[in-house]
Structure formats: C-alpha cells, structure tokens
Amino acid sequence: RFYATQLSSTQLRRADGLNRQGIEAMSFATDYYSNNYPVELLSLATKPANDFQVWYEWKFCYTIIHACNDAIANLHKADMSANKLARYQCEARFLRAWAYNRLNMLYQGVPVYLEPINNEDCTRGQSSVDEVWQVILDDLTYCINNPDFPNNTLNEDYGRPSKGAAYALRGMVSVSYTHLRA
C-alpha cells in the first residue's frame, strides 16, 4: 500500500536531482511536485510547525513507523514459515529505518518508538540525532545479517526491500551521519 499510494503520486519536476524518486528529491536540491502542487524543499526552507509539508512529512513517516512496529511485534502470530517471518521482519525494519532516516534528515532528532503504542502514548521527547542514527543503523544491520533476507529482489518480488537496498540505505545514512558530524 505504501508503494502504491504514496510514492506513485510524487514525481520529479526536472531531471537534475541526485536520484529518480521524487520523495527522496526533497532531501536534496531538486524541485518536485506532488499531484501537480509545487512545493518548496523542506530541507532548504524555514517553515512553521503547522505548515502542510511539515505536518505531512511527520505524519507520513510516523504512519510507516507505527505500522512497522506493529508488524514487528505481531507477525509471529500469523501462520507462516520461519523463513517468511524473518523476511517480513526484515522488510518492516528496513521501512522503519527508511522513515527514521527521512525524519532525522529533515528534523535533526525525533522521538523514537520501537514498539506499538496507542495515540495517547505518543508523548516521548526528542531523541538526539546520534540516537536516531543508531536506531537506523541497528535496523539495517539486522536486515543485512539476516540469512532469510534476499540479496536482491530484481527478478522476483520486484520492488520489495532486500539486502542490496539495506546496504545502499546504510551507506547513505553513514555518509549523512559523517557529513553532519563534521
């Protein structure tokens, strides 16, 4: 659902970005539009907390994070093989790492939730940038080290997370982390 409804509605306005995904282009210096609505880059703008972009990015990423936390905590209850369970756990951790990376790049430290919660429990304070990076790296390392997580998904299950994607995201996170600490 995430891939079909969120990423597909975001497109690049011009092709001079660092990658082809419009959703990622916001992190860098590429214009983009969403459903024909041009938007300033969040990383280059000063926006109030009630701005639509700020609200939407926050909601979008935490929706992914909470869905992943729910999956990680409850997938074991489903009737499936141990290999499939391990793979789905890795996919959920990968997506959670992706969302936390997005939030950390935009907001420089955010509240970290690693277990399912209720709305009234969303009161945690901001974690430091370093703490969030560590959560991301831990999730990606878990995926990379798991033998049931496929090396790539180019032939079957195209578009699903894989070790290759986890290595790539971990590399991006490491570069960002090193750059921001310098």
Listing of model-derived features with the role each one plays in the protein:
Residues R1-E91, L95-Q134, P150-T153:
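Short acidic-aromatic linear motifs embedded in glycine-rich loops, typified by GG[WY][YF]DAGD(H)
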